[in-house]
UniProtKB/Swiss-Prot annotation:
Transmembrane segments: none annotated. Keywords: Initiation factor, Protein biosynthesis, RNA-binding, Translation regulation. Residues 8-20 have a biased composition (Basic and acidic residues). The gene is eif4e3. eIF4F is a multi-subunit complex, the composition of which varies with external and internal environmental conditions. It is composed of at least eIF4A, eIF4E and eIF4G. This is Eukaryotic translation initiation factor 4E type 3. GO terms for molecular function: RNA binding; translation initiation factor activity. Recognizes and binds the 7-methylguanosine-containing mRNA cap during an early step in the initiation of protein synthesis. GO terms for biological process: regulation of translation. It comes from Xenopus tropicalis. Residues 1-20 are annotated as: Disordered.
C-alpha cells in the first residue's frame, strides 16, 4: 500500500479519552489535532500512538500508569496530522518512548493480544533515529511487512526509545512460534540501506525473566 506524502497540517479533534496529558515541561506544549477522523483514505486497520517513560526499578502498576494514549488513527490523513503535531523523536527526553500499535492494544508484553509474540530489537545511531522511526511507521501502516511474516502472523506494532548513547527501535509481531519464517529484518534493511543497525536480535516476550510483571518493555 503506497502512502501519499504528508499533507499540510490538518488538525483533528481527539475524543476526550484519546487526548495526551503531559506534565513534563521538557516535552513542551503539544498541538492537539482538531477535527474528527471521519474522512480520508482509510488504513487497513486502525493504529494507536502511545507515549511512555521507562524507569529502572518501577513497579508493574507504575509502568502501566506511565503509558499515555495519544490518538487512534484510521486514515492516512489522520496519521500525518498526529505525526506532525507530536514532538519529534529528537525532542523526547532520555528514557521516553513512542509506540504505534495495531488497533488499541497497549505496548505491554503481557497484553493478551501480544503475549504470544515478540520483538525484533535493534540499536540505531541517534542521528538516524527520526528517519528510522518515520520509515518504520510508514512501512507498518502501509502493511509492507505483510508478505514478510508467516501466514498466521503479522506485525502488530513499532516502537522507538530514547537511550543514552544510541536509541532503540523495535518491531512487534504477534506469533513468536513462526518467526523463523519471517523476513522482516531483510525488509527493514531494504527500507533503510544506509543505516547502521547494531545489536540486532529477536526475542519472544515469554522468554523475558520479568514476563509476569505486566510492564511495558522497551
Amino acid at each position: 500500500m503506497a502512502l501519499p506524502a504528508a499533507p499540510a497540517d490538518r488538525r483533528l479533534q481527539p475524543e476526550p479519552d484519546e487526548q495526551l496529558h503531559l506534565n513534563h515541561r521538557e516535552l513542551g506544549e503539544l498541538a492537539l489535532p482538531q477535527e474528527p477522523d471521519t474522512e480520508g483514505i482509510p488504513l487497513h486497520s486502525p493504529w494507536t500512538f502511545w507515549l511512555d517513560r521507562s524507569l529502572p526499578g518501577t513497579t508493574a502498576a507504575e509502568c502501566e500508569s506511565n503509558l499515555k494514549k495519544i490518538y487512534t488513527v484510521h486514515t492516512i490523513q489522520s496519521f500525518w496530522s498526529v505525526y506532525n503535531n507530536i514532538p519529534q523523536v529528537t525532542n523526547l527526553p532520555l528514557r521516553w518512548s513512542y509506540h504505534l500499535m495495531r488497533g488499541e492494544r497497549k505496548p505491554l508484553w503481557e497484553e493478551e493480544s501480544n503475549a504470544k509474540g515478540g520483538v525484533w530489537k535493534m540499536k540505531v545511531p541517534k542521528e538516524a533515529s527520526s528517519l528510522v522511526w518515520k520509515e518504520l511507521l510508514l512501512a507498518t501502516i502501509g502493511e509492507q511487512f505483510t508478505d514478510r511474516c508467516a501466514p498466521e502472523d503479522e506485525v502488530i506494532g513499532v516502537s522507538v526509545s530514547v537511550r543514552d548513547r544510541e536509541d532503540v527501535v523495535q518491531v512487534w509481531n504477534g506469533n513468536a512460534s513462526v518467526v523463523g519464517e519471517a523476513t522482516v529484518l531483510e525488509k527493514i534493511y531494504e527500507l533503510l540501506p544506509n543505516t547502521s543497525f547494531k545489536a540486532v536480535f529477536y526475542k519472544p516476550h515469554e522468554e523475558h525473566h520479568a514476563f509476569e510483571g505486566g510492564r511495558s518493555r522497551h
